[in-house]
Amino acid sequence: MMPGRFSNNRVLVFVSVMVVSIVGLLLLPPITQNQNYHDFADQRTILGIPHFWNVVSNLPFIAVGAAGLRQCRREPAIAVLFLGILTTGFGSGYYHLDPNDRTLFWDRLPMAIGFMAILAIAIEERLDAKTGAFLLWPLIALGVVSLLLWRLTGDLRLYAWVQFFPCVAIPVLFVLYSPKFSGTSYWLIAAALYALAKLFEFYDGAIYSFGSILSGHTLKHIAAAAACFAILRYFQTRQPIRTEVWARETVA
């Protein structure tokens, strides 16, 4: 099979899976926002700042996002990713000052942009460079629409796809297709830290009950920012793998 034909087929399969997964999710009943979500364990006011630690623990996102933008601003998908990380720090900090659905929109919007940007990057680096570049802006638009749809209808189904499809698709891409750049270990570190962040989030209250020092949600922010830093280190240190080797491994 010719390499170009192989590439076209795998792109078609991947895009088809994306479309089918969205349609399948939309066939399920609507998902609404549980209002208990806003009831975080650590609600202390310190230095006049409500929910102090849940607010200030977003500073690492701002630092990582700013560093990424400074170093990677010439590559559109990477720049959008770090812009999403930077604005997540501001959006999440704003949300935690007064947790409610209205402020949660501004927390989730930059995250949706970041999720879609990193999916486009994974497609570009593992599946097909032109497809990844082409899908960047449609995916970003989909992320934005998912949040607008939630605010207009109360339905989180599309946002659920935006958040969780990359968590499934990116590992599959990494398993099935060879890398174009060195540094895959940074992606693995980022994935492990993100999984740890979700674990901290789930055990928010249980962690806070141990001494009432820091809550699980605060630790979630720190672990997630560390995952973003691992991705930053990947882009700072990656080196191209020889094209002919990558092509031979991909076609094999």
Where are these regions (language model features)?
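Early transmembrane hairpin module of multi-pass membrane proteins
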Residues: P3-L136, G143-L148, L152, F181-A252
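Active-site rim beta-loop-alpha module in soluble metabolic enzymes
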Residues: L148-F181
